[in-house]
């Protein structure tokens, strides 16, 4: 369409670069979507778990299917790594942990916090990518301790196998963080406090929504 505006009689399009150049010439803004680029790295020698979700992220009830992942946020004095577990039923945040490193204990603490807040998580499926944090013995032992079933991306580690979690992080970082704050002007400690406040607000919104659903069921 941009090329037709430039030349109504039509032209041959040799490449996407031509489209972007013409869009720039006529003042149309082009913002390509970022391609998923996972920060976790797989341990090729580690034992992998099966993909139990197979991209079916819909859940019929709470604490049935969950997804987890790590995201990184740049700060003034380094990077903060944030790990969370989301419920596929309503996208609620079940557990959260933050560290300045990506060791397996980060994911273990996420499980600890999720189970502490939701003991009924026992028996749930928690899906992740094949990063070494999730194939570590530390993480597997935590899953076993809480009776949680592990699921992982299919062979090849395609990002779409954990698309629900990827989209949750992308939305949170874009709408609630980067559009409002310059994270690189904050220290990791200040950023940690800010993220806790953001997730606290999300939890309050989720509780309000649950109350509305409960009330409407009795109307």
Report each predicted region and the residues it spans:
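Mobile genetic element proteins and their domesticated derivatives, centered on retroelements
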Residues: 1, 19, 23, 53, ...
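Basic, flexible linker segments flanking DNA-binding modules
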Residues: 1-61, 159, 216-219
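Residue-level detector of anion-binding/catalytic polar loops
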Residues: 29, 148-149
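RNase H-like two-metal-ion nuclease catalytic core shared by retroviral integrases
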Residues: 39-42, 128-130, 136-139, 152-174, ...
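Active-site beta-loop-alpha junctions of metal-dependent nucleic acid enzymes
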Residues: 74, 78, 96-119, 135
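Short small-residue beta-strand/loop micro-motif enriched in glycine and branched aliphatics
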Residues: 90-96, 150-153, 178-180
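C-terminal domain-tail junction helix/linker
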Residues: 144-148, 170-219
């Amino acid at each position: 369409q941009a090329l037709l505006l430039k030349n109504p009689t039509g032209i041959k399009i040799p490449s996407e670069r031509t489209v972007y150049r013409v869009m720039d010439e006529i003042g149309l803004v082009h913002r390509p979507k970022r391609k998923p680029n996972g920060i976790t790295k797989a341990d090729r020698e580690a034992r992998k778990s099966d993909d139990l979700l197979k991209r079916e992220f819909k859940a019929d009830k709470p604490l049935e299917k969950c997804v987890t992942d790590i995201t990184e946020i740049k700060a003034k004095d380094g990077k903060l790594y944030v790990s969370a577990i989301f419920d596929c039923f309503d996208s609620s945040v079940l557990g959260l942990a933050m560290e300045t490193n990506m060791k397996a204990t980060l994911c273990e603490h996420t499980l600890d916090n999720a189970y502490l807040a939701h003991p009924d998580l026992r028996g749930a499926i928690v899906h992740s990518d094949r990063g070494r944090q999730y194939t570590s013995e530390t993480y597997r032992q935590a899953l076993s301790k809480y009776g949680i079933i592990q699921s992982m991306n299919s062979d090849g580690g395609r990002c779409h196998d954990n698309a629900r979690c990827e989209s949750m992080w992308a939305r949170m970082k874009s709408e609630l963080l980067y559009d409002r704050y310059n994270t690189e002007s904050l220290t990791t400690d200040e950023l940690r406090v800010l993220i806790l406040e953001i997730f606290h607000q999300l939890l309050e919104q989720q509780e309000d929504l649950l109350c509305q659903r409960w009330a409407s069921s009795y109307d």
